Amino acid sequence: MADSLRDGEMAPTSANPYGDGGQLVAAARAAAKLARQVNIPLSEINLSLPQYRVLAFLDEGGAAPSDLAGRLSVSRPSITALMDGLLNRNLVERHSDPDDGRRVTHHLTGEGRSALARADRAVGERLLVIGAHVHAGDSNHLIASLARFGEAIRAAQAAGAA
């Protein structure tokens, strides 16, 4: 197997099944750690990561619970519980579909938009604090790369691959 590797390639191992020198494994683990780092500032403003994700999604336009569940990769009961909590806090409002009275959509309230802006600011500041521990040019590159990864996620979702 080692004979078929190109110069600089590493053979897959149980610790690194990709044989890429560990970059993909390191990236996967960094993504898991990043989720924790996002939770820190969100908890300080009384939002959970799933709530933040819902508010961010609704900022792109209203949505029915089934659409939200699919886009956020959670079960319908989970999205119902999330929405009930956000409704109780007046961060979202529920509207009946004028064409189908059985269908409802959810939209951000003014308070929801304010909460999302606070969350965006808090998470952004946390990313800057973490990024300050690398060279300034690298920090800017990390932030830009993370934003690009968000674009890739949206494209994969639109293609039905995520």
Please report, for each region that a protein language model flagged, where it lies by residue.
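Exposed, interaction-prone assembly regions rather than primary DNA-binding/catalytic cores
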Residues: D138-A162
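Helical hydrophobic small-molecule/effector-binding pocket
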Residues: Q37, R113-S114, R118-R121, A152-A156
